[in-house]
A protein has these predicted regions:
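Class I SAM-dependent methyltransferase Rossmann-like catalytic core
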Residues: 1-37
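Class I SAM-dependent methyltransferase SAM/SAH-binding core
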Residues: 41-88
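A short acidic, Gly/Pro-enriched loop at the edge of an enzyme's catalytic core
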Residues: 87-99
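A short SAM/SAH-binding and catalytic strip from SAM-dependent methyltransferases
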Residues: 97-110
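A short glycine-rich, Lys/Arg-flanked "PGG" loop and its adjoining helix->strand segment in the class I
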Residues: 111-126
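Conserved beta-strand signature within the Rossmann-like core of class I S-adenosyl-L-methionine
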Residues: 123-135
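Conserved Class I S-adenosyl-L-methionine
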Residues: 134, 138-167
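Core SAM-dependent methyltransferase catalytic element
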Residues: 161-187
Length: 187
């Protein structure tokens, strides 16, 4: 991108083009529920039309669930706010038991983004990140998915940011889910 405005424009165009797509990861949320039984606050980043939030609300009915979407379409969907997921919000720091995203590959600044997300985890919180095999191979990035790399390189990236990968699950139709924790917390 030549600048941040172009990034937002490209992400918004992609969002509007894919707005009719349904969230494909219902089985992902079911698995998350088996490894993280309890959660009071859940945040989902890059949620397009809010399918993630609906699934989390189904499995954690008493939890506060919110999602972020950079596009101006965010206000059309319940439990969704328009927000660039890489931008820190003070009220979200150390606030969430679960952070979920299948959109990390959309990051404008991956280093800033992952630090923001790490800081949103409450004590004992878990970050669940989808990483999609072929779609994330080195050299596969494009204007709508600017971050790519092998799973091995992605895990190295997380470790460099003091994010500990606790579990990997690839028993899904598409990609992997990594369950992570803030490696700087003393839990």
């Amino acid at each position: 991108y030549k600048d941040y405005e172009e990034y937002v424009s490209e992400q918004t165009k992609a969002n509007k083009r894919k707005l009719h797509w349904e969230f494909p990861g219902n089985d992902h949320v079911q698995w998350i529920k088996t490894v993280k039984l309890n959660a009071n606050k859940i945040i989902c980043h890059g949620t397009r039309r809010g399918g993630e939030q609906k699934q989390f609300k189904l499995h954690y009915p008493d939890a506060y669930v919110i999602g972020t979407e950079i596009s101006d379409t965010a206000s059309q969907f319940e439990m969704t706010v328009q927000h660039d997921f890489a931008v820190e919000k003070k009220e979200w720091i150390k606030n969430f038991d679960i952070l979920y995203s299948n959109a990390f590959d959309h990051s404008y600044d991956p280093d800033a983004c992952i630090e923001t997300w790490k800081n949103q985890l409450a004590w004992g919180g878990r970050m669940f990140l989808d990483w999609y095999g072929l779609a994330n191979l080195d050299g596969m990035q494009g204007p709508r998915d600017p971050v790519s790399g092998s799973l091995e390189n992605f895990i190295k990236f997380l470790n460099n940011h003091k994010i500990e990968v606790l579990q990997q699950n690839n028993n899904f139709k598409h990609g992997y889910i990594l369950m992570c924790k803030n490696g700087e917390s003393n839990e």
